[in-house]
A protein has these predicted regions:
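Conserved acidic segment of CheY-like receiver
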Residues: 2-13, 17-21, 51
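A short, hydrophobic beta-strand element within the central beta-sheet of small alpha/beta folds
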Residues: 75-85
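Acidic, metal-coordinating helix/loop segments flanking the phosphotransfer/catalytic sites
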Residues: 32-50
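Acidic catalytic/metal-coordinating carboxylates
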Residues: 35, 61-64
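Short amphipathic alpha-helix used as the core "switch/output" element in two-component signaling
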Residues: 41, 63-74
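Receiver (REC) domain active-site loop signature in two-component systems and cognate sites
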Residues: 55-57
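C-terminal output helix
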Residues: 104-115
Length: 126
């Protein structure tokens, strides 16, 4: 089971992504924030397996947020969710587990969840 963090400054999109997460049985908890700072505060006290991050946000961009998440919670897998495919090259420097383009399709999100679960399974077997 995965604990998922969603961060996007667009509230409608944030709600859509969180709703998609809640439909996936392998996700036990979904927390969503429209500001990176709020997400970081929450992460200080709560573990997270997967962070779904928008890249283009006003208070802190998703790339910076990802770096901070990796410092606070090193085991958290990062998946960037954005409407701007040109950010893909910059995002790969963070070594994300994946990259989803908006609007996010249920099957694409499920594919990312399955991939993260396979990584967790591999870690346990090692």
């Amino acid at each position: 089971m995965l604990r998922v963090l969603c961060v996007d400054d667009e509230k409608l999109i944030l709600r859509q992504i969180a709703d998609l997460c809640r439909k996936i049985p392998e996700i036990s908890e979904t927390q969503s924030f429209d500001r990176a700072g709020k997400a970081l505060s929450w992460l200080g006290d709560h573990p997270c397996d997967l962070a779904l991050l928008d890249i283009n946000m006003p208070d802190m961009d998703g790339l910076t947020l990802a770096r901070k998440i990796q410092e606070i919670r090193p085991g958290t897998h990062i998946v960037f969710v954005t409407g701007y495919p040109q950010y893909a090259a910059d995002s790969w420097r963070i070594h994300p587990a994946g990259y989803l383009l908006k609007p996010v399709a249920q099957k694409d999100l499920q594919g990312q969840v399955d991939y993260i679960l396979s990584l967790h399974s591999s870690r346990r077997q090692a």
